[in-house]
């Protein structure tokens, strides 16, 4: 059971920032309640009511180390936690959990910059946010005197699942169930999930793709917000504002590194190229820009599933298209959840609600020319094929000995194209995963035939490139498989009700 944290609840605070639903501005909650809820009533996503309240002097932020920057940024987004508790949460979340002291190191490669976001315990960018979310959520429960046990439901296209399972493992008062597509993720990603320990963790393969799993999870939030007495649902996907906000910090961290190395002057704009399918990672960049960070363009890099590229070019969102399984599976998504937040900021709640209704009923929507023009002030989109991504991996390794994964390769190939066509600003490519999570595709890009056995392929990649296999990935082959269930989408509800009721009789 949770009990109110009176130490922090009685702390004097400034005027609170409210959170509202993207589909109903009259639905208002505190920041901690938004973290607890995950998804707003009626299916909307929580956003800050007033973006101007997030403004800060970025120059005062980037003098700090990573944890110091996180404290300032978290404090803006989550004011009802109070300064002392935010500081405690950040220290618990980021101390001694990442192999790099700077958490997200920036590396200069071939005249561009790669922001390495894979230095955490599951070797993917999701670790940055999912190291913080369990602490944000458990403290939110105390602040709101929330008595229910929390059951986290999370759909994953690969990396969120392992990071969420690891982050929430054995966290008191919280259980987690992850749903992943049974085909279309790498064997390493699958093993990370199905071998995860923790008495409060479950992982289920879903027959279908990520969109099937994500739609199923969203539907459960509407149908069974309390699947049994004493248990409430929440989310660890980036639909949860507590998952999204920690990702804002590394945009500031990248800018700080460029300034500290003398690569840019204070005030210079920086472009960020982001490989994304669900629009969360790039949405964090938009929020960083709203806070006052000098962000130039946010370049959305898509694979063959190019629904976002078409939308950013034409304003037409159409999920009624062929779904492709690619070598960058974490981006194999046709329903991009976080785009709803951008629609709200550009179009308002009523229009956003209408667009989402149209998407649900017809599979598409079209925004106005004026709305698209506003979006194009900040975003541009490109798509690349597997072949272009593979060529980028091979070319960059041959020229610089730098090895990147298949998702980063899509972003690198996009930045290649963008540099030729558009901008002279410094360009930071967000690198979202270790190449050792996708060894078969990376080996193929380097001209080697993969064996089909991820363990052997990791050893071969290490030998070929002179790089080291990350310890967390090496360890998965020694762990026992604990989660073996493969289910149909229409079984998700019964599974969740059963899991929620365990131990409640």
Where are the predicted features?
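PLP-dependent amino-acid enzyme catalytic core
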Residues: 2-7, 11-505
